[in-house]
Structures are given as C-alpha cells and as structure tokens.
C-alpha cells in the first residue's frame, strides 16, 4: 500500500505511509488531478492526512493540512452516500474523515434492518446507525466513547430527519456490552 486516496465531492484526501510514495507525491497528485479532470470531475483541493504513527517507522514526519487549495475551501463537507447526507470532517475525522470502505456494508445493514433492534458499536459519526434507521429498523442505538463523534452522529441524524429514530449513548462499548440483557438487540 503506502497510499490511500479518498474523494469527498471535490476534495481528495490522501494518506501517505511510506517513503517511496512521499518522494513521488507531486507526480502522484498531478496524475490524480489529471485523471479526475479527464473523467469530468474537477478537484478543488487536496488535503493530506499524514498524521499516522506508521510514518515514524519510515522516518517521515507526521502532519496534516491542505497541499492544494486555491479556492480556500473548508475541510468540512457534506457527502451523499446512497441517499443519506453525511457531514465529513476531513481535518479531524478518523482515517481520511470517514470510513468510505464500509459503504457496501452500511447498505447491507440498511437492507436487513427492517423491524429489527440494531446496535451500532463504535458508531463514530453514525454511518451504520443512520442506514439502519433509514432501513426502518424498529430501534437503533449508537454507542461510542467519543462525545464529539456522537455529536457529529446526532447532527448527521438531524440532517436526514432521523434524530428521533436513533438513541446515541456515550459509553465504553465493552462496558456497555457487559450490561446488556440477552437478546436485547437483533443486529
């Protein structure tokens, strides 16, 4: 690997974890901008999330910030994922801002959640909880230790008019699981 590239609307977010990619990032970024342009997608900014510990093993410094941002756009954006609006904080969110690699799993949950009681552990900003609620789950509980993540999840629920369908719980997930009754949740 060594390179992660996620696209949020017109912002590319990159994460470089090895020296080889770091040495060639200008060429990589130029190619990315050109490929997106050729496909009709004009990129307005490139944000680097090179604030991961693995870079230290390669002797690389840890940093994050805009590499390219001629229009001075914000590191926060709203994306649409399969009909659900999500606020993404590219600057402070986990990984590159959101877990795009879980997109198909969130849709799978949406498709099986109808009339089920769903528990979303380590809910982050609520992607799975939102999809369960959108899929007409009977009840949805989102648990995370981070109050900031839960607040973002609640804002995402409001953005989609689902705030009354999801209960947000700030707790250590392992402690929370210990206190559950048998069969309290279906999923």
Please tell me what each predicted stretch does.
Residues 1, 9, 58, 125-126, ...:
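Short glycine-rich loop/turn motifs that provide flexible caps or phosphate-binding loops at active sites
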């Amino acid at each position: 690997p060594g390179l992660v590239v996620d696209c949020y609307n017109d912002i590319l977010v990159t994460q470089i974890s090895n020296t080889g990619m770091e040495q060639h990032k200008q060429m990589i970024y130029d190619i990315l901008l050109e490929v997106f342009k050729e496909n009709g997608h004009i990129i307005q900014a490139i944000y680097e999330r090179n604030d991961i510990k693995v870079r230290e093993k390669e002797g690389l410094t840890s940093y994050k910030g805009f590499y390219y941002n001629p229009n001075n756009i914000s590191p926060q954006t709203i994306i649409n994922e399969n009909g659900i609006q999500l606020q993404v904080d590219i600057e402070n969110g986990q990984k590159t801002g959101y877990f795009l690699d879980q997109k198909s799993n969130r849709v799978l949950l949406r498709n099986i959640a109808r009339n089920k009681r769903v528990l979303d552990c380590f809910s982050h900003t609520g992607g799975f909880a939102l999809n369960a609620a959108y899929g007409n789950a009977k009840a949805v509980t989102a648990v995370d230790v981070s109050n900031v993540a839960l607040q973002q999840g609640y804002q995402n629920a409001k953005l989609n008019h689902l705030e009354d369908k999801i209960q947000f719980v700030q707790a250590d997930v392992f402690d929370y699981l210990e206190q559950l009754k048998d069969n309290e949740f279906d999923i």
